[in-house]
Amino acid sequence: MDGPGTGQSPIKASPTADRMLSRVLDYLGTRPEVDKTRIAMHGVSWGAYWGTKMAILEKARLKCVSVQSPPTDLFFQKEFVLNSLLGNREYLFDQIPAIMAIFDNVTTLDQVVDEFQKMSLVNQHLLGQPTAPMLILAGTLDTQVPISDIYKLLDSGDVPKDAWINPKGGHLGRQVGVWPDPRIFNQVILPWLARNLGAKPLDDKH
């Protein structure tokens, strides 16, 4: 589904926009064909931020959560915005204008910095709280989300987390010609989700 502030999402990104994702869980709870005890979430980049929040706030309703390159704290600090996100070459488009678009009435760099301070999971006093079981994937060479944010998440909470860190990978752990998205998804993420949900992984014919 589209995350807050993107695509057809009905609301913009904000410190409380995770309420939209909680409504999705409410809806799934009304569907008779859905096993309410085996709901998982997977998030990528900004989606990984929301996935991390949901792993904390909706721990009781999520069986497990996998996230790729989740920003947690340093990503939202002024120094990182100015030194790493502004003019970032790893992102396919102009990242700062793209970030402005997910927030309501944010049109300047100073406003981005102000909004980002509110989004930090440390500033929201969430990092360190209990979480659902998590798989955290990242690349050490990521220029969009600092690897320190990943380690900060791994070091927090109440239960051990599974990690897949590619020392030669960039954003999402991708490595050109070695670890493209399909390989990461099929060989790392899907087996982990299947194992944690008690489901049989798809064979190579699917």
Regions found by a protein language model. Give the residues of each.
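Catalytic histidine-centered segment of alpha/beta-hydrolase-like enzymes
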Residues: 169-183
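Hydrolase active-site cap/lid region
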Residues: 56-115, 132
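Catalytic histidine neighborhood in serine/cysteine hydrolases
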Residues: 154-173, 188
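Conserved alpha/beta-hydrolase
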Residues: 1-8
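Short alpha-helix in the alpha/beta-hydrolase fold that links the catalytic acid
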Residues: 132, 145-155
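Short beta-strand/loop motif that positions the catalytic acidic residue
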Residues: 130-131, 136-138, 142
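Gly/Ala-rich beta-loop-alpha elbow adjacent to hydrolase catalytic centers
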Residues: 43-47, 51
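Alpha/beta-hydrolase active-site loop
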Residues: 12-38
